[in-house]
Amino acid sequence: MGDTPRVVFVDTSVMTCLLDVPGKNQDREEVIPQYQQYVDGGVTMILPVTSVVETGNHIAQLADGRLRREAAIRFDRTLAKVESGVAPWIPNELTWDPAMVGRLRNSEVTGDDLVERLAQKVGAGDCMILAERAEYSERSKIQ
């Protein structure tokens, strides 16, 4: 498999492309083949709670009610597959505790802190995904 990772976290931008969320799907043609390569390669794909929340927010903010409902249905069907274990990714087990708050505030992954990341226009959702990834790495011992 060469450069194929063993574990990846599914980012919000990937979820919105896979779900074809209008206005958030501009990289869909690039994301689908990469996603399929991961599925075919047996890569463990972790679905962070932050990606679920952000994707739901993007769907809820769609102006067109018909498109909003269609995207919401796709989102719900996808989450049902995750819940039943038939989706190719698994939900990240997240404990919201002081240690997680510490990971959010001080990232070992990026080597800087929350203030610096926000000042560099890195959103809180992306910061939380990094914190979730750090927690997963600690728990699983997979880097």
Q: Where do the protein language model's features map onto the residues?
A:
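Short, well-structured N-terminal submotif of metal-dependent ribonuclease cores
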Residues: 1-50, 58-76
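Short beta->alpha linker loops
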Residues: 50-51, 128
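Generic short alpha-helical segment signal, independent of protein family or function
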Residues: 60, 80-83
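Structural element of the ATP-grasp superfamily
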Residues: 77-78, 133
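Active-site neighborhoods of divalent-metal-dependent phosphate/nucleic-acid chemistry enzymes
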Residues: 83-143
